[in-house]
Amino acid sequence: KWFYLFAWLGVLVFGTWAFEKMLSQQKNPNQQVQTILTREGVKKVVLERNRYGHYVVNGWINDQLVELMVDTGASDVSIPETLAKSLQLKSGAPSTYMTANGPITAYRTRIDKMQIGDIVLNDVRASINPAVDDITVLVGMSFLKQIEFTQKGNQLILAK
């Protein structure tokens, strides 16, 4: 009798874990990206579009793992305030940004080191956004303009 109870409990726990992993992969199919090094020495990272049409990827800010979403419409890398505090980023001068939901005030900052795959940039301009509850960092043009990027089908190719 106890055996069946523990067996069903094990199936339930495993099923819940597998379902959560599947949902996580649907939101962020780029949890472990590979870097391709070309003969010319160019580093390329290929991102897969998620089921919602976005490019979400795990990356690093100042050697701390973060979730990133590519946003070519954003001027700067935009970091939610709660995450900026845990990354120990200093809040600078206020600046007004136009968003899809209207103007917001965010605070200028600099990221010492930002990394996607083996593509590493230093001293990246960013903003700390107090109006966002999420923990996903938007990768805006202050990062993207320093690399090459090409979108083909359901893939975004980053190169440096």
State what each model feature region is.
Residues 1-67, 72-160:
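Pepsin/retropepsin-fold aspartyl endopeptidases
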